[in-house]
Amino acid sequence: DLVPAHVRKFFFWIAPALTAAPAFLCICIIPFGSSITVFDQPVKLVIADIDAGPLFVFAIASLSVYGITFAGWASNNKYSFLGGVRSCAQMISYEISLGLSLIPVLMVFGQLNLSDIVHSQADNGWTLLPLWNEHGSVFDAAYWQNCKEQWLLMIPLTISFIIFTTSIFAETNRMPFDLPECETELVGGYHTEYSSMKFALFFLGEYAAMIVGSAIIVTLFFGGWSLGF
């Protein structure tokens, strides 16, 4: 585990943890399933079933910007610094579209509890694929008599899905939004000077953020754990 002599050591050491910790904290509010019974007691398959799930994710995930800022500045390297500046600018910019894109979805469900949103989709069809509702499935005549509003809502919800998914790609530095760490320009971005476990923590945090983003997309748009049959 090499630590270059020219770095600002305290901030250099703390930056990987500040980057990875928010991503792992966000996993706490993801509902992985319905309740199970353990010793005759119902247990929810979510660590923290709070009533402001998406807001919690936005609030905590934005803290990783500080870790990236420290990493770029503390490395005392022009490539790392430029990578950190690029990453911070990109993350802050796309957080706006990330938050605004969820407003139509949350207005449809009228709540912020992710478990309740999944239960609502289990009863009335997925957000983007309302193939069933309380009157039956697409194979029932009663369904087609009471599904016009659901299919009309797909227009704004599909736009929300596209914007949200694109913003998740940008927030996690995936192609084609990999400007902060493009090797042809910035060598390795803000983790150029890092090695060993500190280097691994950056990537663990990045991939944990990808898992959280994917889980939120599935929870809000594709029914979470519910299959509808």
Which stretches of residues belong to each language-model region?
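Selective transmembrane helix interface/packing segments
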Residues: 1-229
